[in-house]
Design a protein with these regions (language model features):
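Hydrophobic transmembrane alpha-helices and immediately adjacent juxtamembrane helices
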Residues: 1-258
Length: 258
């Protein structure tokens, strides 16, 4: 006697399989494959470390080594930026699947969002190994999944809005790319923002990017957990998610025609 099928379980497994395929497709044909997910951010860290620590010879006063401080910040930032960029083009990248098979459109967003997690896990594993090597391990690490989940919700919520717009307005991809580049330079990823900074610089510490980057650093490097900052950013995530929900209901039916 055949066991009754579980539609929800089958859908979840399908989304997970397609998310894995989506991640592998990014590195299809390359010699090193998904290893590039770790190589690229490492090279980024080395370049910024060399430019600011060696070439520019700037002063750094912290018990934590600059390369490690930078690595943790970049791990959080790349999760945000790469995730949003990838989400923005989701409907266009999967247009063939939607048009030919009538694939569930909201699932496309979930596939792309989950796919972004894999690359983050690879680089984060390297960062955690460096943290252990530099002896920054503490009990506060148990809160890291909370910050990662908050970033994931932010990426999904923002990416959903951008992907809906991009499905009808292709230039949205370029706009998002430029916007993320600007946000990178004003977010304290490779530079330190004073906690006592006055207006307008003081506003930066309340931006999502700064909150996420500082949240990762506080947990992994300084053994502290700022519950107020996490609650604040979860409220921001929820607000963006709520804004995106009616947009999805209104716009998603026309996606296949884009």
């Amino acid at each position: 006697m055949n066991k009754p099928k579980n539609p929800l379980k089958n859908r979840i497994l399908t989304i997970l399989r397609l998310a894995v395929y989506d991640f592998k497709a990014k590195y299809a044909g390359s010699v090193f494959g998904f290893i590039w997910a770790g190589i690229e951010p490492i090279v980024t860290v080395i370049v910024y470390w060399f430019v600011y620590s060696v070439a520019a010879n700037f002063s750094w006063s912290d018990d934590c080594h600059y390369y490690l401080w930078l690595s943790v910040g970049i791990s959080a930032w790349l999760f945000i930026s790469e995730g949003i960029k990838s989400m923005t083009s989701a409907f266009r990248d999967y247009a063939y699947l939607i048009k030919k098979t009538g694939f569930n459109k909201p699932s496309v967003l979930r596939i792309r969002a989950i796919s972004c997690i894999f690359g983050h896990i690879i680089f984060l594993a390297i960062v955690l190994a460096l943290c252990v090597y530099e002896n920054t391990f503490s009990s506060a690490w148990i809160y890291l999944p909370l910050w990662s989940a908050a970033i994931f919700l932010f990426v999904y919520s923002v990416g959903r809005i951008f992907s809906l717009i991009c499905a009808k307005f292709k230039d949205m991809q370029n706009i998002v790319g430029i916007g993320l580049n600007i946000c990178f330079w004003i977010t304290p990823v490779f530079w330190r923002l004073s906690q006592n900074a006055s207006f307008p610089a003081g506003i930066i510490k309340y931006t999502p990017g700064a909150v996420f980057v500082n949240g990762y650093r506080s947990v992994l490097l300084y053994g502290t957990f700022d519950i107020k900052a996490l609650i604040y950013i979860i409220c921001i995530d929820a607000l963006i998610f709520i804004i995106g929900s009616p947009m999805q209901k209104r716009m998603i039916s026309d996606i296949a025609d884009g």
